[in-house]
């Protein structure tokens, strides 16, 4: 039994870093014979707009392409903005026959498969969700960087036998940093007194009576001094970027807040966690067949 042609006019695009090879398949509804038109484009904006014009010339509104690295994203954005439906599929679903691969053949192969509706289209959320996702992923990267810097800072304290981490729960807190600024500027730690440190620490600090013992007699080598100063400066900068990301995430999620705010009622899910979840799966659950696919 012959396969049913689902799309009489469709396009397959083979995506590369600097090159797009597109094939439009035009099928005669009477004879079911398909004619092909091919064209190559570079990936600069004027050429992407020429791709749109070329597709419109043949009244082609359906396009299929591989999810090749990040190279598909500019193509997707331009086609989406011009009302063209795009199916992004994993390369394994449109893999061509070995030893018979060229860009033109790959493009035609994608077109043929798409004509019969064979490729499985990947879930691509709406534009506003995709933009939010880029920010949340960047935020998570920054969180990881800040965590790594905190670990490096603590390692420097350990190597220098500075027991700051045992006194303060947060070595980047105000009291801890006040003490560290003083310690790093001091010529010698052997002559430190409790009076020198008491003014630097919050009066509610529980372990400030042990602070002098945690510091006195420690030896901070020049390399550790340099690292402690640089890490502290970098951590402050990262905190500023994290705050900026949070503000941007809150701003972008406002129009969608009524659709996802109930997620925060679940135990263990904060507002930030809810935003990150929505940025990955969107707010429309009908696109998922079941919970397992989700």
Summary of predicted features, one role per range:
Residues 1-294:
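A detector of single, family-specific signature residues
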């Amino acid at each position: 039994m012959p396969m049913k042609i689902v799309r009489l006019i469709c396009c397959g695009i083979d995506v590369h870093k600097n090159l797009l090879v597109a094939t439009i398949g035009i099928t005669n509804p009477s004879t079911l014979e398909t004619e092909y038109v091919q064209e190559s484009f570079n990936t600069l904006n004027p050429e992407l707009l020429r791709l749109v014009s070329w597709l419109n010339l043949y009244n082609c509104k359906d396009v299929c392409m591989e999810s090749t690295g990040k190279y598909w994203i500019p193509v997707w954005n331009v086609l989406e903005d011009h009302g063209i439906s795009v199916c992004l599929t994993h390369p394994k679903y449109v893999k061509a026959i070995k030893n018979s691969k060229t860009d033109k053949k790959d493009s035609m192969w994608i077109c043929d498969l798409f004509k019969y509706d064979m490729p499985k289209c990947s879930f691509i959320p709406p534009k506003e969700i995709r933009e939010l996702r880029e920010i949340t992923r960047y935020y998570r990267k920054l969180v990881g960087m800040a965590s790594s810097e905190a670990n490096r800072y603590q390692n420097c304290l350990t190597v220098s036998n500075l027991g700051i981490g045992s006194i303060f729960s947060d070595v980047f807190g105000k009291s801890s940093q006040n003490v560290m600024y003083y310690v790093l500027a001091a010529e010698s730690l052997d002559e430190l007194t409790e009076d020198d440190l008491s003014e630097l620490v919050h009066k509610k600090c529980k372990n400030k009576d042990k602070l002098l013992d945690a510091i006195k007699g420690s030896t901070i080598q020049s390399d550790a001094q340099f690292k402690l100063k640089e890490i502290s400066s970098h951590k402050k900068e990262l905190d500023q970027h994290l705050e900026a990301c949070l503000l941007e995430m809150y701003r972008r999620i406002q129009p969608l807040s009524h659709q996802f705010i109930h997620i925060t009622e679940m135990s263990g899910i904060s507002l930030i966690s809810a935003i990150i979840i929505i940025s990955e799966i969107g707010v429309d659950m009908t696109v998922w067949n079941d919970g397992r696919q989700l």
